From Swiss-Prot:
Keyword annotations of the record: ATP-binding, Cytoplasm, Disulfide bond, Nucleotide-binding, RNA-binding, Transferase, tRNA processing, tRNA-binding
Recorded GO MF terms: ATP binding; tRNA binding; tRNA-uridine 2-sulfurtransferase activity
EC number, as in UniProt: 2.8.1.13
Binding-site residues for ATP, renumbered to this chain: G12, M13, S14, G15, G16, V17, D18, S19, M38, G127
Subcellular compartments: Cytoplasm
Family statement: Belongs to the MnmA/TRMU family.
The reaction(s) this protein catalyses: S-sulfanyl-L-cysteinyl-[protein] + uridine(34) in tRNA + AH2 + ATP = 2-thiouridine(34) in tRNA + L-cysteinyl-[protein] + A + AMP + diphosphate + H(+)
Record: active site: C103, C200
Lineage of producing organism: Bacteria, Bacillati, Bacillota, Bacilli, Lactobacillales
Biological-process GO terms, alphabetical: tRNA wobble position uridine thiolation
Primary localization class, coarse: cytoplasm
Primary enzyme class: transferase
Name of the protein described by the UniProt record: tRNA-specific 2-thiouridylase MnmA
Amino acid sequence: MTDNSKTRVVVGMSGGVDSSVTALLLKEQGYDVIGVFMKNWDDTDEFGVCTATEDYKDVAAVADQIGIPYYSVNFEKEYWDRVFEYFLAEYRAGRTPNPDVMCNKEIKFKAFLDYAMTLGADYVATGHYAQVSRDADGTVHMLRGADNNKDQTYFLSQLSQEQLQKVMFPLGHLQKPRVREIAEKAGLVTAKKKDSTGICFIGEKNFKEFLSSYLPAQKGRMMTIDGRDMGEHNGLMYYTIGQRGGMGIGGQKGGDNAPWFVVGKDLSQNILYVGQGFYHDALMSTSLTASQVHFTQNMPDKFTLNCTAKFRYRQPDSKVDVKVNGDKAEVIFDEPQRAITPGQAVVFYDGDECLGGGLIDNAYQEEKICQYI
């Protein structure tokens, strides 16, 4: 039997059930485990209670229960500089960012990893639903989590080979109900705690209110692609490509009652374009361009790739051809795709292996750029 007692694993503990069970499993496997709570955002709810304080109490209770030391580390400045400023800049540019991708890249597997090294860590572990496999030569591959509903490789797609070398995902082979079962059997205080949802720094707050407290909203015209005036929008940043509803327009007199969708944005003219029908022509595209393209393995500067891709979390994979040039790529779809959204991640897969990904810049219909500018 392997003696893990000399291998130190520092676990990122959020106060949720997933990271609690991660720490428990590693402790049971004999590792030298330390728990660390990351405070990334100064947050108080409507009653003036800091939700991070409550989460830290749960971390402390779980750590005491399973018998591991624990620390708290403050990454508020790093989070603001590396994740939140990016989030605001993307919305300013009329895009729809994915802060979770950036948080994993910059905070959980960079700032936290660096901190863990000061504690003498051999590895860091988190409660993400993903798996890693290690080749004989030490190369690490990232694989989808066994629970298809929970697989989080989409959000981990910007991790480098160097980061993956130091990572463990103990929940990767488990289904979520089994994780709760383990927590309940061990009597962990977090066993029945509900999963957190949404963007971590917004929490349960109204998204519109939150965004408008940081970025001024500018109202403007709402139009169809063929130029019909449809009234006024409340600010382009509040709308995302493919969004249904929230525009204040229902069935039009003398027209059909098909639902309305956001089909485009013109930032320079401050116009929101809308259209009827889920598969409205303006929502369909045949390719995209991406930047900040990155692979988990060391790859040449220029190459082509035939693989599958996801353009948003929890969507089925689609077959694509990828032409990579440095940190940029053109991604050509086998079948037209709906509502490709600038700012979101495009993530590449070969079977169950997550190869990497990038951030979507623009979508195209044949050679023509879609109206997402």
